[in-house]
């Protein structure tokens, strides 16, 4: 059980990254383009990183990053196979790599916020 808990952050990030990617590929395509800000959808990738960092064993950043890096090629394959590509391969690759960045940033933000609320144990000298 302990071995599975070590990889809970990576698995959680892998699944949530693909879910967010599919959600943005299906539902949000027209909304952000009509507003003139297609990159706003990338901010949704902060959520998988933060949630995965919460489920990581010691509130790590590397396990969510690893899960996002594994999910990016799977997401690219799913988007290429099941959706008609509207952008070139290189544009979608750049979009997915920036999504990995935002996912890691979400894990870092959660780590920062949780360190602010963690009680400090200081020795009085």
Swiss-Prot record:
Cellular compartments annotated: Cell inner membrane
Predominant subcellular localization, coarse grouping: membrane
Cytoplasmic side: 1-6, 56-64, 114-125
Coiled-coil stretches noted in the UniProt entry, renumbered to this chain: none
Cellular component aspect of the GO annotation: plasma membrane
Membrane topology value: Multi-pass membrane protein
TM regions (residue ranges): 7-27, 35-55, 65-85, 93-113
Domain of life: Bacteria
Membrane topology (Periplasmic): 28-34, 86-92
Entry keyword set: Cell inner membrane, Cell membrane, Membrane, Transmembrane, Transmembrane helix
Protein name: Inner membrane protein YbjM
Upper taxonomic lineage: Bacteria, Pseudomonadati, Pseudomonadota, Gammaproteobacteria, Enterobacterales
Gene that encodes the chain: ybjM
